[in-house]
């Protein structure tokens, strides 16, 4: 399970250090793809296969389903680490998440999210402002 928040810098070649706590769980191969809310999702290969299986079961006769599957797969890349524990994030994915020098990596249960630091701070601030309403909705799920 991924959890925690880490700040790292993206270098000029699009390389980002992945914290050792996350590297250990990602193994040697994993998938990086566009995520929701303007971040990137990073899945261990085993978890990506589960996502892939669920997405393949969506009825393809619905336009929104087709669009979402395209969104998740079109720019997905299988990655590995270099000797320094970095990954190269392709330009198209960096543009999607508006990644600049300062990045935040967040563990979110079955995946890691990579955020532009400023966008992450805005997202957290908004979540904190609405936390009571969010929590109230989750009570229905037994949380």
UniProtKB/Swiss-Prot annotation:
The keyword Transcription applies. It is found in: Cytoplasm, Nucleoid. Keywords: Cytoplasm, DNA-binding, Repeat, Transcription, Transcription regulation. One of its GO terms (molecular function) is DNA-binding transcription factor activity. Its main location: cytoplasm. The keyword Ubl conjugation does not apply. Residues 5-47, 76-119 form the SpoVT-AbrB domain. GO terms for biological process: negative regulation of DNA-templated transcription initiation. InterPro entries: MraZ, MraZ_C, MraZ_dom, MraZ_N, MraZ_sf, SpoVT-AbrB_dom, SpoVT-AbrB_sf. PROSITE patterns: SPOVT_ABRB (PS51740). GO terms for cellular component: cytoplasm; nucleoid. Belongs to the MraZ family. Forms oligomers. This is Transcriptional regulator MraZ. It comes from Pediococcus pentosaceus (strain ATCC 25745 / CCUG 21536 / LMG 10740 / 183-1w). The gene is mraZ.
